Amino acid sequence: MGKLPMKEAALVYLDRSGGLQKFMDDCKYYNDSKQSYAVYRFSILINPCDVVELDAELGNHILHHPLKAAQVFQSVCFVAVKTLSLIGKLQTETQINIVLKLTHLPSLPSYSLDLCEFPLNYASQRFYMMQGIVIAMTTVTKYTQGARFLCSDEVCPFSKGFQYIRVHVPGATESATVRNDFLCRLCSSSLQEDRKFRVLGDKQIIEIITTKVLHAFQGDPKNQPFRFQSLSVFLRDELVNKMKIGNEYKIIGIPVCVKTSQTALCVEANSITPYTAKVPSGISDNFRCLLSLTSSSCWRFTAILANVFASHIVPLGTYNLLKLCLLMSLVQTRDCSSERENCLDILVITSDTLLVDRLLNFSMNLVSRGIRHPVCTEVFPTVSRDKYGTGAVSIQAGSALLARGGVCFIGDLTSHKKDKLEQLQSALESRSVTVFIPGKKFGDDFDQQMTFPIQCSFWSFVDMDSSSRRNVQKASTLIGQMDCSLIPANLAEAFGLLVNCKESSPCHPLLPTVQHTLKKAVDPKGPPYLASKQFTTEDFEKLLAFAKNLNVEFSLEAERMIHGYYLASRRIRTDSIHGSKLSANALKYLVSLSEAHARLNLRNKVLREDVLIAALLFEISLTLKYGATAFCVAPNALFPFELYDEDYLEQRDLYLTQCQQQLQHFIATCGPGTAVLSSDE
């Protein structure tokens, strides 16, 4: 088939798809403009499947020879402009710059570019689809979108007019569009650029990694060496600032080879689509059966979950308070496309850092964005000079932005320097981080600031019983208060939950831990308990993935109770000298805890029973920080008995019912008028 039938097919497609009408509207904009143009840029949306059905050869050109396909549409559009007199100032076909924007690519392996496979096909100059997470991006700079050249010989007919128009094509460098060694094809004289007709566009470079290499940031249990490489993606014009650090995208683009100090594979992006993870349709049969058996109580299902969770890491029934907090934090994570930001940050006070480290690392890996912060890198974004010599500033993600929508586990809090802890405190309080870009250092006249939202939960622990720290601990004068002098008080307050897992706490029974360790040493691969077979790690992954996507709303009773407890607690923990001890985010933490418990129960409505669990957890945390108050909560209030059978669950329900009555009495006694609340409160 020659070019004429393809041009006819292109015209038919434009007419059927509505592209012709959009093209005419764009032409009207150019024609009505008082500005003179050397290059007229048109973006045409292409559905490859529709084109292939209409004309197979044109579809093949679009998929495998996009530059030639653009020339076909360029010719069609030029004829349309001249025939319909759409742009009066247009003189030559080369003045039309056609950009084909693909909606998708066929779901075939040959159109997918896997960043983990070798070799990568970058010589074919055709479209591929790749998927990755943004780990770095540059500031926006300019590039030459199009330029007009004239022959330097005034006698030559090409010293006037628009015969020599150069436009950017995918994969081309700046020197391919504009330089001083072009020659006239008529008289061989040198060409000179007419600078007043130069067209500039926006350019941005981002770096992505494939999702498969996230295990490098999740703590490899086998301690095997690994290596991964990022891929640079060039965004131009309307695609600039369409991608956010930490988000995952599907990218259609053309791979090209760029030579800097060393040869690097890059991609010229054509279209970008945010990636949305599939939500599981349900939970495992074992959990469904357990949910049915415990439906008579609002507290039993989550109690059993915490009891059997991570049974191959810690003994069955131990660390239940911490495990419940971890599960609630995990269900408050969400996909990057979600607007929900109710994160739950956890700080663990422990004397067994090895076991707690293993438990937190295992829990973190149950969500897709669980990032263990490597010691050699930065938690928050950093800036450096762009390696491609564009003059732009490159902003590297850091662990916190990479964990977007998930969990950032930063290890032992005391291993971080003072300035980093101050930065962490600021991020926890404001849920954002600001990057300062000094103008002098990067060749700019002005300093810049860029602010990024922090959309992950932070987990950390503090070893309070190490030999180097025992001597500096001070005895507490308040009931229930724990000495946290090793970390700044404001930083401890910034964490939503403070969990005590020291030897003196109910979380830390010694004998079961010894028995569990011996059992694992004798049979490392075997499940240590029957519950480990019934509720596997995969079952918990599926449960969490389903629960975190539930949309929950507060019942009126739950809303009144949570506001009542907040006002009463704020009132009783306020003095005339220091003011209120509750942070500005206290109410947000209570709401998040209540929602988390409802989600973990697989419910769409937050009940008073959920608010009770939230209030108990929050009060235990406040007691560790400031000591007990009138609403005195025992450290083991959520798990007062060992959960051996149904009778113990019944006793726990009775105990929590008594706690609920105490909470209501506390609200009635200390809460100043909680029956009617304004929307602001």
UniProtKB/Swiss-Prot annotation:
Modified residues (Phosphoserine): 292
GO molecular function, one term: DNA binding
Pfam family, one: MCM_lid
Domain of life from the UniProt record: Eukaryota
Assigned GO CC terms: nucleus
Secretion signal span: none
GO biological process, one term: synaptonemal complex assembly
Keyword terms, alphabetized: DNA damage, DNA repair, Meiosis, Phosphoprotein
Annotated MCM domain residues: 533-621
InterPro entries, per the entry: MCM (IPR031327), MCM_lid (IPR041562), NA-bd_OB-fold (IPR012340), P-loop_NTPase (IPR027417)
Biological function: Plays an important role in meiotic recombination and associated DNA double-strand break repair.
Protein name: Minichromosome maintenance domain-containing protein 2
Source organism (scientific name): Rattus norvegicus (Rat)
